[in-house]
Design a protein with these regions (language model features):
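Alpha-helical recognition segments enriched in aromatics with Gly/Pro capping
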Residues: 1-34, 49, 99, 120-335
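N-terminal, positively charged nucleic-acid-binding surface of large information/translation enzymes
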Residues: 10-13, 19-107, 460
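Short Gly/Ser/Thr- and Asp/Glu-enriched loop/turn motifs at secondary-structure junctions
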Residues: 21, 108, 138-140, 453-457
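Short phosphate-binding/catalytic loops that engage adenosine nucleotides
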Residues: 60, 134, 449
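Short catalytic-loop micro-motif centered on adjacent basic/acidic residues
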Residues: 64, 109-113, 229-231, 374
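Short, glycine/charge-rich beta-strand/loop segments that flank catalytic centers
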Residues: 68-73, 94-97, 107-122, 140-149
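Structural preference for alpha-helix termini/caps and helix-kink/transition segments
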Residues: 272-274, 278-463
């Protein structure tokens, strides 16, 4: 296997050499569950799903861990704003996240740890950091990582300490020894989630800072050293930089993650996504208008490290593209075949997840498939197309199901009504009542249903 990945830590594309060739380990930062995910959040879900598929195909064993952050100040603020109980808010939001990820065609990770289940591990890591002199506790119950104690801090983002302070809206608090120091643990008042700890008043009742959560969860489920740490480029600083600091200083002699993989920013309709501009799309809103697979294809048509300009026009084009693929698969009436992933598509993915090239090569396989279908619809083998699609998480639906999908908010005919009208038209044609047959066809066209007359049947699909 010659897999090459761009490693943010090395600023270069590198040949992927796992620590244990028989067991690849990957950790990806998951959602903070206070709100529905938007299309920007969907990008890492889809990108790291493709990487997971590729690793699973290429290595004997892969463990993919993606966490749920269910303790955070954003969650506390949303619960206060809506009057919803915090546990109810995080449980319901997590469930919606799972539904949206499934609609995007993402496989479930092997492990999905929740931050609140790992408080003991977080406290243990913080205690080690205090013992090593890398962290300090204040009288009021704050514990902070002391950034000057780590000379190599800033290596991932490539910025020095002063630049980091200027570039991040660092909270300058009186309890900090240095403006760059960041919170590992903070005190909680009675209204907020909290756990007993060794620091501060009220039995040290407090809650973890954001960064310490991922350090503790990745170590628990993947060990001190693992292969890949992934996330959006917006997490490079401060989140991933701070994870490195905590993990290396809290576990001396270890290396933490070997390869750091980050997907690029997402624009929406040519601008930064914002509710005030009307270009803020939640995945859930988009799924009312488009099938999830069209969202997935749209996200795969730009290389993962490049900025992606997401548009509804792009989604419409992706839907039309998938209509062509599924139309060909539906026309193939022979035996379904199973073959290994196509080498051309694999080669594209092994070159730093070049999904745009992989999608182009999928189009080439479609052309080959259509050539065979024109000669012999019964023996056209769909195995190459389906196995290549599987690596990208595409083309795995039943073609009939694909064409029967309709927007949630559309005033459309139901499947039973359409089937009844198609049968009535077939009878009218058999009775040579062509005026009635045309009337039914026109009514279906007006309702967004397209008919295709085959020698022995009529099949339909929605526009």
């Amino acid at each position: 296997v010659t897999l090459n990945l761009y490693n943010t830590l090395a600023r270069a594309k590198q040949a992927f050499a796992p620590i244990d060739p028989n067991h690849v380990r990957m950790y990806v930062c998951g959602p903070t569950v206070y709100d529905l995910i938007h299309i920007g959040n969907a990008r890492p879900i889809v990108i790291f799903d493709v990487l997971f598929r590729l690793l699973t195909h290429s290595f004997p064993k892969t463990t993919y861990v993606r966490n749920i952050t269910d303790v955070d100040d954003k969650i506390n603020a949303r619960a206060l704003e809506t009057g919803v109980n915090i546990r109810q808010l995080t449980t319901e939001t997590t469930e919606r996240f799972h539904q949206d990820a499934a609609a995007l065609g993402a496989l479930e990770p092997d492990v999905e740890p929740r931050a609140t289940d790992h408080i003991i591990e977080m406290i243990a890591l913080i205690e080690r950091l205090i013992e090593s002199g890398n962290a300090y506790a204040t009288d009021d119950g704050h514990v902070l990582f002391h950034v000057p104690s780590m000379p190599s801090y800033g290596r991932l983002s490539g910025r020095n300490r002063d630049e980091l302070i200027a570039g991040a809206r660092v909270e300058v608090a009186s309890y900090k020894k240095d403006p760059a120091d960041f919170v590992l643990w903070k005190p909680s008042n009675p209204e907020l989630p909290g756990w007993e700890s060794p620091w501060g008043p009220n039995k040290g009742r407090g809650r973890p800072g954001w960064h310490v959560e991922c350090s503790a969860m990745s170590q628990k489920h993947l060990g001190d050293d693992f292969d890949i740490h992934g996330g959006g480029v917006d997490l490079v600083f401060p989140h991933h930089e701070n994870e490195i600091a905590q993990s290396l200083c809290g576990n001396p002699g270890t290396h933490f993650a070997k390869y750091w993989v980050h997907n690029g920013y997402l624009m929406s309709e040519g601008e930064k996504m914002s509710k005030s501009l009307g270009n803020f799309y939640t995945v859930r809103d988009l799924l009312e208008e488009f099938p999830g697979e069209a969202l997935r294809l749209t996200l795969l048509q730009t290389h993962y490290r490049r900025p992606l300009d997401f548009t509804k026009d792009g989604l419409r084009q992706a839907k039309a593209t998938l209509d062509r693929f599924y139309g060909a698969l539906r026309d193939q009436r022979g035996v379904k075949t199973t073959v290994d992933a196509h080498p051309d598509v694999l080669a594209a993915l092994e070159d730093d997840l070049n999904t745009p090239l992989a999608v182009r090569r999928l189009h080439g396989l479609l052309d080959d498939f259509n050539d065979v279908l024109r000669r012999d619809a019964v023996n056209g083998e769909d195995g190459a197309l389906l196995s290549a699609g599987r690596m990208l998480g595409l083309l795995q639906q039943d073609p009939e199901e694909w064409f029967r999908w309709s927007p949630t908010n559309a005033n459309t005919l139901g499947e039973v009504e359409i089937d009844t009208m198609v049968a009535a038209r077939r009878k009218a044609r058999a009775d040579r009542d062509f005026a009635e047959a045309d009337r039914i066809r026109d009514e279906l066209v007006d309702a967004g249903v397209i008919l295709e007359d085959k020698p022995d049947e009529t099949i339909w699909r929605r526009k």
